[in-house]
């Protein structure tokens, strides 16, 4: 008898449709950006709701996300899930306070992958804010010059003693009044 040779390949392992779906990489999210307008009620609650459409069609978020501003300020934010809703919770109020967010500010969120968002912040005049240099900005001490004649800069309490020249810093940044919200009172500091 002659040895018959066929061109048919032997079938590979048979997998179920459910297994095939699990093996496919997660599709690219269709929604990667959203805008939020800051409301006084949300500042008081110390949480911010992520838009439902972003939650539904955007990337799957881990329990912690990172918010990063254009100057490199980063803050880790804990996610709270309530039913189908997703909220920025723990760490959000610190982020809001560090950037002096108040009623009427709006934020542009751009998802960059790996549970990280780039955040651009606009004030009530629709102008981008001046960002704090980093999240350790509050750990600074005033430095007086040798003659005690006046303020010359800031010295960070956690660095190697480098002094920041305020004249140089002010040339780079235009000084704006900061707004702090205490309960429902708005106080403008010069």
Curated annotation (Swiss-Prot):
GO terms for cellular component: nucleus. GO terms for molecular function: DNA binding. CDD domains: B3_DNA. Keywords: DNA-binding, Nucleus, Transcription, Transcription regulation. It is found in: Nucleus. InterPro entries: B3_DNA-bd (IPR003340), DNA-bd_pseudobarrel_sf (IPR015300), Plant_B3_domain (IPR050655). Residues 1-27 are annotated as: Disordered. Residues 33-125 bind DNA. Pfam families: B3. It comes from the Eukaryota. Disulfide bonds: none annotated. This is B3 domain-containing protein At1g49475.
């Amino acid at each position: 008898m002659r040895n018959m040779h066929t061109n048919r390949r032997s079938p590979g392992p048979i997998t179920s449709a459910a297994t095939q779906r699990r093996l496919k990489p997660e599709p690219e999210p269709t929604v990667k950006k959203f805008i939020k307008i800051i409301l006084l009620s949300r500042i008081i609650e110390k949480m911010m709701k992520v838009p439902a459409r972003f939650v539904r069609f955007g990337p799957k978020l881990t329990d912690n996300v990172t918010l990063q501003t254009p100057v490199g300020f980063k803050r880790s934010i804990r996610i709270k899930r309530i039913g189908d809703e997703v909220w920025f919770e723990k760490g959000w109020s610190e982020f809001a306070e560090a950037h002096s967010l108040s009623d009427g500010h709006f934020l542009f969120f751009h998802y960059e992958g790996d549970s990280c968002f780039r955040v651009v912040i606009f004030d009530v005049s629709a102008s981008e804010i001046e960002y704090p240099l980093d999240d350790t900005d509050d750990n600074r001490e005033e430095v007086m010059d040798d003659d005690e004649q006046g303020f010359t800069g800031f010295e960070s309490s956690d660095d190697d003693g480098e002094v920041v020249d305020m004249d140089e810093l002010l040339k780079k940044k235009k000084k704006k009044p900061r707004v702090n919200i205490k309960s429902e009172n708005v106080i403008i500091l010069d």
